[in-house]
């Protein structure tokens, strides 16, 4: 997942006010992984484009040429979701895809503009 802003994470208490302000001023986009119900911040990049690229790279590192089912999730940002889906479809060995809204519990904490990939093996 990549967050468009840390403002909602700040309001939910997951990120401090100073961190959110600095991220906003520097146009930093955090990268988070949700695995087994645990959210972990795993990186930060300077632009939205770089963040989406890094999300795809992480998927490639995990699945390389392995056949996968691919889902793109988004929080009120269908356009970014569609772009991410098109890019990912061209790079992965995809068996099936879906694009859907991010769950309400995550969208509330991460805010609008959050976009991510969900990959799992097709075999």
Set out the residue ranges of the language-model regions.
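Mixed-charge interfacial surface used for oligomerization/domain docking
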Residues: 1-123
């Amino acid at each position: 997942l990549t967050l468009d802003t840390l403002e909602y994470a700040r309001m939910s208490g997951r990120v401090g006010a100073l961190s959110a302000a600095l991220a906003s001023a520097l146009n930093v986009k955090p990268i988070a992984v949700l695995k087994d119900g645990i959210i972990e911040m795993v990186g930060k990049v300077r632009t939205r484009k770089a963040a989406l690229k890094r999300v795809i790279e992480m998927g490639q590192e995990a699945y390389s040429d392995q056949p996968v089912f691919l889902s793109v999730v988004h929080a009120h940002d269908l356009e970014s979701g569609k772009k991410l889906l098109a890019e990912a479809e061209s790079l992965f060995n995809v068996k099936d895809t879906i694009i859907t809204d991010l769950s309400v519990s995550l969208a509330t904490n991460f805010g609008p503009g959050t976009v991510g990939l969900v990959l799992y093996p097709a075999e």
